[in-house]
Amino acid sequence: MKLKSLIKSTSDWFSSTPERALNRAYKSALKIQEIETKHFRGQKVSRENADYGASVITYFETEVQSYLQKINMELTVFKASRLFLSLSNLQDTENNLGTGKVKSEQETTAIIIFDKLKFIDEVIAKYKSNAIEKNVSNNVAIIAASERNPEVTNSAPSGKKSTKVKDQGVKNKTINFESASQKTGVLPRSFMNTLNKIKQEIDPKSGESEEQVLTKYRKSRYRTALSIKFILLLIIIPLLIHQLTKTFFLIPVVEQYFSRHEQVIFINRDLEDEALEELQHYEETLHFRGLIGLGPELSPEKIEQEVKQKAGEITEEYRRHGIDSIANIFADLFSFIAFVLVLVNSKKEIEVVKSFLDEILYGLSDPAKAFLIILFTDMFVGFHSPHGWEVILEGVAHHFGLPENREFNFLFIATFPVILDTVLKYWIFRYLNRISPSAVATYKNMNE
C-alpha cells in the first residue's frame, strides 16, 4: 500500500513539473517587469532609461541577468517535461477526447499557458542580445585567436584589440594552433622566458606594459575558469548520462527480459562456479558450527531447508549482478557517445584547455617534471605495474560481467605497457628534450 502511494505521489509530482517550471519562469518575468516599472519608467534596464550611477545600473543589470537565466532554465525544463509527458500520455489523451469536461479543462489550461508564455516572451524580447552569453563567446574567440597569434593582442591599441583579433582570426583560419610544446628553439624555453620578462620590465613604454600585463591576467583568469568548467563537464555529463540511462531505461528493460526467461540465472560460467562455491561453503559452515557447538545441531532436513533458502538468496543476487552487468555495457556506450558529442561541439574550448594544460605542464620546475614522469612510468610501465594492470582488467571484466580470461590478461600485460613506455620515451626525447633539456637530465639522474 505504501509503495502504491509512493508511486502515485511521484507520478503526480512529475506530472506537475511543467506547471511548476512555467510558474517559476513567470514569477521571474514579473520580477523583471517590477524592476522596469519602479526604476526605469517601464523600459528596458539600461543606462539610457535612468539617471542612476554606474554601480546602481550594474546592480540592476546583474539582477535582470540572473532572472533571465532562471527563465531560460525553467523554460527548458518546461519544454522537455511537457514533451515527455505528451508522449507518455498520448493514449490517455486519445481515450478522453470525447469527454466534455476533460476537453474544457484542457482548453482552459492551454489558454493559461499561452498567456504566461506570451508575457514571458514580451519581457525577455528586450534582452535577446544577452550580454553574458555574448561576452563568453567573445572571450572564447579572443583566447583561441590570441593563442594562435599572440602578436595580435599585444600589438593592437586598446580601443581596437578585439576588432583586430577577430579580423586576424578570419584571415588566418588555416594557421594551426601553436601550443607550448611547439614553441621550441635553439635556447631552452625557460631561458627565453626569463629574457622576455627582463625586457618587458625595462621597457620604457611602461603604460603599454601595464596594459599588456592586465590583459594577460584577465585572459589567464578567464582561461583557467573556462578550462576547469569544461573539464568538469567532460566528467559530469558522461557520469550523469550513465546513471540516468541505466536507472530509468536499461535496467527495467533487462529486468523484463530476465522475468520472461526465468531459467537464465548466470550470464557466464565463472559466476555459476562462484555461486556454487558460496553455497557449498554455507552448507559446510552449518555442519561445522553444529559440530563444535557454536550453533544448534541441525537435522539433515533442517540443513536442506537452510541451504534451499540460501540458494534462493544467491540466485537473486547473481541475477541482479547479471542485470547490472548487461546494463553497464549499454550505459557505458551512451556515456561514450555523450563524451564524444561534448568534444565535437567544443572545439574552441578544447583549444583553450590544451593551452591551459600546456602552461601547467611546461611551467613546472624541472625536478617536478622528472618526479611526475618517474611516478607515471613506475606506476604504469614499471616493475610492479603487471599487478596493477591485473587488478584493472579483473575490475573491467567484473563490471561488464565477462568471464576472466587469463591468456588475454597475460597478453595485454605483455604488450600494452611496452607500447605505453615507447610512446612516453618518444614524447620525452621528441618534445621535452627540446623544450626543457634540464628536466630530461634530471629525469635521467633520478632514474639512475
Swiss-Prot record:
GO terms for molecular function: proton transmembrane transporter activity. The chain crosses the membrane at residues 231-251, 323-343, 372-392, 408-428. It is found in: Cell inner membrane. It holds the Pfam family CemA. GO terms for cellular component: plasma membrane. Its main location: membrane. The keyword Repeat does not apply. Keywords: Cell inner membrane, Cell membrane, Hydrogen ion transport, Ion transport, Membrane, Transmembrane, Transmembrane helix, Transport. InterPro entries: CemA. It is a multi-pass membrane protein. Belongs to the CemA family. NCBIfam families: PRK02507.1-1 (NF002703). Required for H(+) efflux immediately after light irradiation to form a rapid H(+) concentration gradient across the thylakoid membranes. Together with PxcL, contributes to transient H(+) uptake following dark to light transition. This is Proton extrusion protein PxcA. It comes from Rippkaea orientalis (strain PCC 8801 / RF-1). The lineage of its organism: Bacteria, Bacillati, Cyanobacteriota, Cyanophyceae, Oscillatoriophycideae. The gene is pxcA.
